[in-house]
Every structure is written in structure tokens, then in C-alpha cells.
Amino acid sequence: MPMQVGAVQTCRGSHTHSVVSGPDADGKIIVYNSGTSSIRDEEELAGCFDSPGDNRTALFRTDVIEIPLNNPSQAKIVKSPAVFADEETGVLAGLWRGGDHGDQTQRTSRTDECHDITVFPAANLAAGACSGNGILFDITDPYNPQR
């Protein structure tokens, strides 16, 4: 019978968990979390920010979770990289910022989260369905996915 052995609270909840690697030599598994909910209040979970212009925002990020096999109750977020940031400018909203696509089209929301992430460890790639964008990530270093 399955039994819960741990839990990790995230700022945007959890839609999909993707096992990226592991266990490694240290007995740890790396998981990416795709959160799609609104951001929790900081009073509910410390470190959750949603203030306009605050670069600490939980938007535009994917959580990297480390799970030690010898004690899964100690699983934790070890990084939350801003995977949508523009590499040249550093602007977090580096992809679609939302808006109208032209006459007789719909308005769409900004790209600030991934609905699903599928990983291909043998190729060091992950593919994300991210707010209407198909995105590839280099996961050569699973702790630091790069768009």
C-alpha cells in the first residue's frame, strides 16, 4: 500500500512532477515541479513573492526538488531558476508577455509557467508545454536547466 513519506510545499502548488535524474552517487533523485496555481501569500509560505517588479517572484520559474532516498521526508526545493528570463537583458518575462496577436485573434496570457515538463535524460533535454509555448531545456546540469 502506498504511504506518504514526505511533502514539499511550493509557492505555486504542483501540477506535474518530472523525474530528471537519479539516484545519483549520493542517493538523491532530482525532480522538476511545474506549478500552475496563483502564488501563495508569503504569510502562508515564506519566500513566495508576487509583487510587480520584484525579481524574487515565483512566476517564470521551475522548482528543482532534491529527494534523498535514505530519508525522503527531507525532500526540499534546492533551486527555482528563472527559466523564461531573457539571457541578454535578464528580464524575467523573456518570452510572450501577453496580449493581442492581431485582428480577429484572441488575447493570450503571458508565459510564466509550464503546464507539463517531459524529460529525456539520455539526450540531456526536457520539453515543456509552457503557457502556449513549446520550450526545450538543456538539463546537462539537472540543478540548472537552461532554455
Set out the residue ranges of the language-model regions.
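Feature marking well-ordered beta-strand scaffolds used for ligand recognition
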Residues: 1-147
